[in-house]
Regions:
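Amphipathic alpha-helical transducer elements in NTP-driven molecular machines
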Residues: 8-11, 21-28, 55-72, 85-90, ...
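Intrinsically disordered, low-complexity regulatory segments
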Residues: 1-100, 119-153, 422
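Metal- or metallocofactor-binding catalytic centers and their adjacent structured scaffolds
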Residues: 229-263, 271, 435
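Conserved short loop/turn motifs at secondary-structure junctions
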Residues: 80-82, 175-179, 254-263, 273-278, ...
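Intrinsic disorder/low-complexity segments
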Residues: 100-120
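C-terminal or mid-to-C-terminal helical accessory/interaction module adjacent to the motor/catalytic core
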Residues: 129-208, 254
Length: 755
C-alpha cells in the first residue's frame, strides 16, 4: 500500500501514525508545471490545453513515483486539501497511469468528479496531520475533484498567458528582463498610488496646546486642547488666556465598552499579525506555518475560514475553564466574512490545545505561540473597558475645551490569554464636576501634518484582501515577486517602491489600466472560484479573457513607441559635456540623466547630479569568446573583456548584448584578495566575509557561498556585540559600530542612544 503526500516532512510525521501499514512517500511539492518562457507550452487552439513538463531537478521524483505506483496494490493520494493539492494529486495520477486523471465524462461534469478507472486509487483529505484525522480520512476516500483541479489549472494558464504577452511587450518597449503579472501588477499599482500621494503631499502647520494642572488633591492632570489651530497667533492667544484664567472641571464622561474576542486566524490575518507583532515577512510566516502543520502541531494554514470544529471548540472551552475559570469561557462561532472561503477548511488552530510551546525553530515557536493564544482567545469572554474623559476649561471661557482621556480594564476576558493585545491602561485622577484645577504650565508646540504612510507588508495584505485581489495563499508570493524584481524595497517591514517599479507601473497604467484594475482582477478571482464550484466553464473563461487581451497587446505593440526617455530632468541639471538639457533614462541599475542630444553627446549624470563617464575602456583578457570568437567575420569576432555589472566584476564577451557569454569563476585572485576582509564567517566558521556588489549596493557575504549564505550589509569589524554576541559591523559617522543582527537593540543607532 502506497500513501503519497507532497512534503517529506509531512511523510515522516505520518509514517509514525501508520506503523508500517503503508509506505509513505512524497512528491516534494509540484513536480510538473507549465514552462515559464515558452508560449507554445499552452495549446490555445485545442482549448487552452497546457503542455506540462517535469520541473527541472524533479525527474528522479517523477520516476520514483511511477515505479512505486506500479508496484502498489493501493495508492492513497493525500496531498493538501486545496486546489494546489488537488492538482498535485491529479498530476501523480496522470504520470502513473492511475486512470483517475482522465477528462470529465458527461456523467461527472456536474459534480466535478473524475470517474474511477483504476480501483486501486483513492483520494483522501485531512486538515490536520494527526492520527485521528488521518484514520478518519482513510475511512472516507473520494475521487479527485476535477473542478478544484481545473480552477488551479485555469489560474496557472491565466498567469502564464498574461505574463507571456505583457512581459514580452515590456521587454521590447521599456527594458529587457522586466515583467508584469496578473496579480503582482495590481499590487504594485496600489503601492504606487500611495507613493504618488506622498510625493504630492504638502505639509501644513498646526499647533498642539498642552495644559499641565493639579487637582484639589495635588494629583497631576495633563490636558490637551481639543482644537489644533493652524495659525500661530491663535495658539499664542489660547496660551495667554489660559495662563490668566481660573481652571475648573467642566464635565466628566464615563463609558463602558466591550472589546470583543477576535476570530481565530485565517491565512491573511495570520500573516498580518505575524508581521505586526513578530516582524515576520509573509513568506517567512508561511514557511514556519508549513513546518508546524507538517509536524502535526496546527491545522492547515491556507484557509479563508474562521470556523472551528465542534471538537476543537469543546477542547478549548474545557481548557479555558480549567486555566482561567468559568467566567472566562464563552464558546462562540465566528462567521467567515470572506466570500471566497475555500473548500470547507477550518481556521488555523493548534491541534492539541494542551501544548503551549512547540516548534523546531525559533520562528515556529513564536508563530505557534501567536496561533495558540488567538485560538484560545477566540472562545473566551469579551474584555470590559471603562473609559473616562475629563473636560476642563477656564471660568471666563473664550478658549476651546481641554480634555484628558483615560482607560481602565475592568474585566480582562480574552486578554488573559493574549495579554500582548492589551492596550496600556491610562489611569486618571478622581475628580468631580466644577472641581477647581491649578494650572502649573501651559504651552504650544508647532507641528506639521504628515503624509500618508507607506504600506507595511501587513497593510498591503489587508488592502489586497479588501479589494479582492489575489487570495491569501498567494499574498506571500506576491510580496516576494515585487521584491525579487526590484520593484519594491523592504525596509523595516515598510514597502518602498523603487524608480524601476515606478517606471513599470506608469507604463502599465498608461497602456493597460483596465487589465491591472481592481475590478478586473477581483472579478477574475471570483470567476476562478466559480470554476472550483463547477459553476463556470474553464475554456469559456480563458477564451473570454485571452481573445480580447491578445488582440489589445498586438495593437499596443504597433502603436507604443520605445520608451527611451521617461521624463525631463530638472532645468538646473545640464549636460556636463555640452551644456544641453537632460532627460531621465532607465538602465539596469535604475534611472539616470542623459544628454538630450544622445548619441551625438554621451554626457550623463546620476539622479543626484554627479557626472559620470558612460564609455569606460574595457580591458581585454587576451581570450576569444567561446561562443562567437570564431563564428563571426574578422573584425566582428568576440573577445573576452573585464566588465562591471550590478553584481560586481565579471568577464564577458565584447559583443554584448548580441552575445551574452559570461565566463564563470573569472574574478582575478588580486580582486578576490582585495575584497576579502579576513573576518571568519560566524555561521559556517569555514569561509571569510568578502565584499560583494548586489543590486542594492555593497554587502559582505561568506566566501563559502553557496554552501553558506550568511551576509551582512556593512563591513564587519571582527568584534562581537556586547548585547547578543553577534558580529559587529561598521556603523555611521556618529556611531562607529553596530550589531549585524537586526533584532538586536544594538543594531539601530537611535535605539542604542535611547538605551
Amino acid at each position: 500500500k502506497l500513501f503519497i503526500v507532497e512534503s517529506p516532512a509531512k511523510s515522516k510525521t505520518i509514517s509514525k501514525y501508520l506503523e508500517g501499514e503503508y509506505k509513505v512517500t512524497s512528491s516534494v511539492g509540484h513536480f510538473r508545471d507549465i514552462p515559464k518562457s515558452s508560449k507554445d507550452a499552452i495549446d490555445i487552439e485545442a482549448g487552452f490545453v497546457p503542455n506540462y513538463q517535469i520541473v527541472p531537478g524533479k525527474e528522479r521524483v517523477a520516476s520514483e513515483l511511477k515505479s512505486l505506483c506500479a508496484k502498489a496494490d493501493e495508492v492513497i493520494l493525500a496531498t493538501d486539501p486545496d486546489r494546489e493539492g488537488e492538482a498535485i494529486a491529479w498530476h501523480i495520477a496522470q504520470i502513473c497511469n492511475l486512470g483517475n486523471s482522465k477528462p470529465q465524462t458527461l456523467n461527472s461534469k456536474q459534480t466535478g468528479k473524475s470517474e474511477i478507472q483504476n480501483s486501486k486509487l483513492k483520494r483522501i483529505v485531512f486538515h490536520e496531520v494527526t492520527k485521528p484525522a488521518i484514520l478518519e480520512a482513510l475511512a472516507h476516500p473520494r475521487d479527485i475533484d476535477d473542478n478544484l483541479r481545473k480552477a488551479q489549472e485555469a489560474r496557472r494558464v491565466l498567469d502564464r498567458l498574461f505574463g507571456y504577452d505583457l512581459s514580452a511587450l515590456i521587454w521590447k518597449k521599456v527594458r529587457y528582463g522586466l515583467s508584469a503579472g496578473r496579480v503582482q501588477s495590481p499590487a504594485l499599482r496600489i503601492l504606487m498610488e500611495r507613493e504618488r500621494k506622498i510625493r504630492a503631499f504638502r505639509p501644513k502647520d498646526y499647533w498642539v496646546i498642552t495644559a499641565h494642572t493639579e487637582t484639589k488633591g495635588k494629583n497631576p492632570l495633563v490636558l490637551a486642547c481639543t482644537e489644533e489651530p493652524d495659525k500661530e497667533a491663535e495658539a499664542v492667544r489660547i496660551v495667554a488666556e489660559g495662563k490668566k484664567g481660573v481652571w475648573r472641571v467642566k464635565d466628566i464622561e464615563e463609558t463602558n465598552v466591550r472589546r470583543a474576542a477576535p476570530a481565530p486566524f485565517t491565512t491573511s490575518t495570520l500573516q498580518q499579525a505575524a508581521s505586526n507583532r513578530l516582524g515576520m515577512a509573509p513568506a517567512q510566516t508561511m514557511r514556519a506555518a508549513q513546518g508546524l502543520y507538517e509536524a502535526g502541531h496546527i491545522t492547515y494554514m491556507r484557509t479563508d475560514s474562521t470556523v472551528l470544529s465542534a471538537t476543537a471548540q469543546k477542547e478549548i472551552a474545557s481548557f479555558v475553564v480549567g486555566e482561567y475559570g468559568t467566567e472566562y469561557s464563552t464558546p462562540r462561532v465566528h462567521k467567515t466574512k470572506s466570500k471566497s472561503a475555500q473548500e470547507a477548511h477550518e481556521a488555523v488552530r493548534p491541534t492539541h490545545v494542551g501544548k503551549k510551546t512547540v516548534g523546531g525553530t525559533p520562528e515556529q515557536k513564536r508563530l505557534y505561540d501567536l496561533i495558540w493564544r488567538r485560538a484560545i482567545a477566540s472562545q473566551m469572554a469579551d474584555a470590559a473597558i471603562a473609559r473616562t474623559k475629563i473636560i476642563a476649561t477656564t471660568e471666563a471661557g473664550g478658549i476651546p475645551d481641554f480634555a484628558a482621556h483615560g482607560a481602565r480594564t475592568e474585566f480582562f476576558g480574552w486578554l488573559k490569554a493574549d495579554p500582548d493585545a492589551k492596550s496600556d491602561d491610562v489611569e486618571l485622577p478622581k475628580v468631580i464636576k466644577d472641581e477647581p484645577l491649578t494650572l502649573t504650565d501651559i504651552s504650544s508646540e508647532k507641528k506639521q501634518t504628515e503624509p500618508p504612510k507607506r504600506y507595511t507588508e501587513a497593510g498591503l495584505i489587508k488592502e489586497l484582501e479588501k479589494r479582492g485581489i489575489g487570495r491569501p495563499s498567494t499574498y506571500a508570493s506576491i510580496m516576494k515577486t515585487l521584491v525579487d524584481r526590484a520593484y519594491v524595497l523592504r525596509e523595516n517591514r515598510t514597502l518602498h517602491p523603487t524608480e524601476l517599479g515606478d517606471v513599470v507601473d506608469t507604463f502599465l497604467e498608461e497602456n493597460f489600466a483596465d487589465y491591472i484594475s481592481d475590478s478586473f482582477t477581483s472579478e477574475m478571482e471570483d470567476d476562478l472560484d466559480q470554476i472550483a464550484e463547477g459553476k463556470k466553464d474553464y475554456v469559456k473563461l480563458l477564451k473570454d479573457f485571452y481573445g480580447p487581451f491578445s488582440k489589445y497587446v498586438k495593437e499596443k505593440t504597433k502603436t507604443i513607441g520605445k520608451l527611451t526617455n521617461i521624463g525631463k530632468a530638472p532645468a538646473n541639471m545640464r549636460c556636463p559635456k555640452c551644456g544641453s538639457a537632460m532627460v531621465i533614462k532607465l538602465s539596469r541599475a535604475g534611472t539616470f540623466l542623459s544628454c538630450e542630444r544622445f548619441p551625438e553627446c554621451d554626457g550623463a549624470r546620476t539622479m543626484e547630479g554627479e557626472s559620470f563617464d558612460t564609455k569606460k575602456e574595457l580591458k581585454e583578457t587576451g581570450e576569444k569568446c567561446p561562443e562567437c570568437g570564431d563564428s563571426l567575420p574578422a573584425g566582428r569576432q568576440g573577445k573576452l573583456v573585464e566588465r562591471e555589472g550590478k553584481f560586481g566584476k565579471f568577464v564577458g564577451c565584447s559583443n554584448y548584448p548580441k552575445c551574452k557569454f559570461i565566463k564563470k569563476g573569472a574574478e582575478s585572485e588580486e580582486a578576490k584578495r582585495a575584497a576579502d576582509t579576513g573576518v571568519v564567517c560566524p555561521e559556517c566558521k569555514k569561509g571569510t566575509l568578502a565584499e560583494r556588489k548586489g543590486r542594492f549596493g555593497v554587502f559582505y557575504s561568506c566566501t563559502n557561498y553557496p554552501k553558506c549564505k550568511f551576509a551582512i550589509k556593512a563591513k564587519p569589524t571582527g568584534k562581537l556585540c556586547p548585547e547578543c554576541s553577534s558580529l559587529m559591523m561598521e556603523g555611521t559617522k556618529t556611531i562607529p559600530e553596530r550589531c549585524s543582527k537586526k533584532e538586536c537593540l544594538n543594531h539601530n543607532p537611535h535605539k542604542l542612544l535611547k538605551k
